[in-house]
């Protein structure tokens, strides 16, 4: 017998057929750093680094920025013309949008003749003048125009759409200031900067309004506090703030803490001046220059009141009073009131630096006369006379003792008598030379010990 051999082939039942893997695109061959972007078809670089290949059909984008004058570094396909402009994908899209918007602006509206031509097909002619041929031609023309109008109708633009009832959005806050970029998905850098700038300006204005509101509330609460304090002071008196007499131990402790808190909150010296300058700058920035000028003028005015009217004079530097009312300041030491005279008292302020007891010009006391008048001077001889010198001091005017005055005038008389005697002797000649000269009257000369000493001329 012949044996029949049957070979059973293995089946694929129960086995998972391998799925052919799709070939992954090769990455960019940029050498300076690894780039994971896929290559362009038929090229070795991606769209970002395709300009590294000089033989690739790409060149640099022709767009030049108007702000900084730099050229776009992206790649753009080479145009057919050698000198033609070529843009990258982003700038090509922007250029297309700009051209589309410009075409919308420059496209003229529907002309009246065009509208009449389109509506002429619906005009009914008179019944008597209509013939079968004309009716057939008219019918065909109407069908042609209807088919043309249905097939070639232009799409409706945004300006031609129905805007709806304008009062429907009356309750919306942003209806008057609708942002055209509110629902945009992608923003440029300029648009983002503009949006953030507007938001920051709006936030700044809101902060300023809130700060002014808080200032108003602070002033109102301070006014109420001062009013309540005044009412309490009038009703209870100032004993609670001036002295601890009649208070309990706890109340005295609270009063002590209150005084310490007041001293702690108060500023002194340089800190007070700097705080005042800071406050003036803030007022100038918030309330404006007019309020600051008014505050400065009011702070420079004198604080004195004359007949219930405030003095309008400008105060002196570092003080709150003018020159007329500076003596009302108990802390100043540079001015004193004029004493005046017993009959007419005077209260005019005078600087202390002039003298210990200053006086105004009206009550100023002249010093005693210290120089000898011209008519009281004794001229000796017939020579040239010089004007009196202010250095000639006459001590006799200040001497109150008469004997001492006579003693002081003694040498002057002796010199005069000696000159007269000499002239007489020269006039008598030798005949009187044998006679004894007439004795001169003795006069006293003041010595060092103050006693007169007799003198004689031989």
From Swiss-Prot:
Positions of the UniProt region annotated as Disordered: 126-182, 419-458
Any single Gene Ontology cellular-component annotation: histone acetyltransferase complex
Domain of life from the UniProt record: Eukaryota
InterPro entries to which the protein is assigned, alphabetical: NSL2, Potential_DNA-bd
Annotated keywords: Chromatin regulator, Isopeptide bond, Mitochondrion, Nucleus, Phosphoprotein, Ubl conjugation
GO biological process: chromatin organization
Residue span of region Required for interaction with other NSL complex members: 308-364
Acidic residues bias (residue ranges): 167-178
Record has Phosphoprotein as a keyword: yes
Phosphothreonine carried by residues: 131
Main localization of the protein described in the UniProt heading: nucleus
Compositional bias (Basic and acidic residues): 135-144
PTM sites of type Phosphoserine: 147, 149, 168, 172, 175
Cross-link Glycyl lysine isopeptide (Lys-Gly) (interchain with G-Cter in SUMO2) mapped to chain: 78
Keyword Secreted carried by entry: no
Compartments, as annotated in UniProt: Nucleus; Mitochondrion
Cited Pfam families: zf-C3Hc3H
Subunit composition and interactions: Component of the NSL complex at least composed of KAT8/MOF, KANSL1, KANSL2, KANSL3, MCRS1, PHF20, OGT1/OGT, WDR5 and HCFC1.
Functional description taken from the UniProt entry: Non-catalytic component of the NSL histone acetyltransferase complex, a multiprotein complex that mediates histone H4 acetylation at 'Lys-5'- and 'Lys-8' (H4K5ac and H4K8ac) at transcription start sites and promotes transcription initiation. Required for NSL complex stability and for transcription of intraciliary transport genes in both ciliated and non-ciliated cells by regulating histone H4 acetylation at 'Lys-5'- and 'Lys-12' (H4K5ac and H4K12ac). This is necessary for cilium assembly in ciliated cells and for organization of the microtubule cytoskeleton in non-ciliated cells.
Protein name: KAT8 regulatory NSL complex subunit 2
Organism: Bos taurus (Bovine)
Recorded name of the encoding gene: KANSL2
């Amino acid at each position: 017998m012949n044996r029949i051999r049957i070979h059973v082939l293995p089946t694929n039942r129960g086995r998972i057929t391998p799925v052919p893997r799709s070939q992954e695109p090769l990455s960019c061959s940029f050498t300076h750093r690894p780039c994971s972007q896929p290559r362009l078809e038929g090229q070795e670089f991606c769209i970002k680094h395709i300009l590294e290949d000089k033989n690739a059909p790409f060149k640099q984008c022709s767009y030049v920025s108007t702000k900084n004058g730099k050229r776009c570094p992206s790649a753009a396909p080479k145009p057919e013309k050698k000198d033609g402009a070529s843009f990258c994908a982003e700038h090509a899209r922007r250029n297309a949008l700009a051209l589309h918007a410009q075409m919308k602006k420059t496209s003229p509206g529907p002309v009246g003749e065009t509208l009449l031509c389109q509506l002429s097909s619906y005009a009914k002619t008179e019944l008597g003048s209509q013939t079968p041929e004309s009716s057939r031609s008219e019918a065909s023309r109407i069908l042609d125009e209807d088919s043309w109008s249905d097939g070639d109708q232009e799409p409706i633009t945004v300006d031609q759409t129905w805007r709806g009832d304008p009062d429907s959005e009356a309750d919306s806050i942003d209806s008057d200031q609708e942002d055209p970029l509110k629902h945009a998905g992608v923003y440029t850098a300029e648009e983002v900067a503009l949006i953030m700038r507007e938001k920051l300006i709006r936030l700044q204005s809101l902060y300023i309004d809130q700060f002014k509101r808080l200032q108003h509330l602070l002033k109102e609460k301070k006014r109420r506090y001062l009013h309540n304090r005044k009412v309490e002071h009038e009703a209870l008196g100032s004993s609670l703030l001036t002295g601890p007499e009649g208070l309990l131990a706890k109340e005295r402790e609270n009063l002590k803490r209150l005084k310490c808190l007041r001293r702690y909150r108060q500023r002194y010296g340089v800190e007070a001046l700097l705080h005042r300058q800071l406050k003036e700058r803030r007022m100038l920035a918030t309330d404006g220059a007019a309020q600051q000028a008014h505050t400065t003028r009011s702070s420079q005015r004198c604080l004195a009141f004359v007949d219930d009217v405030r003095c309008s004079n400008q105060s002196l530097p570092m003080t709150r009073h003018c020159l007329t009312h500076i003596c009302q300041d108990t802390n100043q030491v540079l001015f004193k009131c004029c004493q005046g005279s017993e009959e007419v008292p005077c209260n005019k302020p005078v600087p202390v630096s002039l003298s210990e007891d200053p006086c105004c010009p009206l009550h100023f006391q002249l010093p005693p006369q210290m120089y000898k008048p011209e008519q009281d001077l004794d001229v000796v001889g017939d020579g040239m006379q010089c004007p009196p010198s202010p250095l000639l001091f006459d001590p006799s005017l200040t001497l109150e003792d008469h004997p001492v005055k006579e003693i002081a005038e003694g040498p002057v008389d002796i010199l005069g008598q000696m000159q007269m005697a000499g002239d007489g002797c020269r006039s008598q000649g030798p005949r009187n030379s044998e006679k004894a000269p007439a004795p001169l009257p003795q006069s006293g000369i003041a010595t060092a010990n103050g006693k007169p000493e007799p003198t004689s001329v031989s």
